[in-house]
Amino acid sequence: LYSYVEHDCIIGDYVTFAPGVKCNGNIHIEDHVYIGTGAVIKQGTPEKPLVIGKGAIVGMGAVVTKSVAAGTTVVGNPARILEKK
């Protein structure tokens, strides 16, 4: 039950990774983000990294294919907005 973080990722302060998270390359995760068990964050590009905004929540098993705005909760495959603060 491990999580992994690939190349060129930037992770902010107070970020929580539950078990089994897969964080692929060129991703920027801002402060106070929670990423649920088994979530997959697809790879960004060096020119346009995938961004998980401040205070966002990624639900268990979600597959994130595009950036998530700050304060947003996303769930599902592919990840869709459940709630926006």
Can you name each region flagged by the protein language model?
Residues 1-75, 80-82:
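Structural signal for interior beta-strand "rungs" in well-ordered beta-sheet cores
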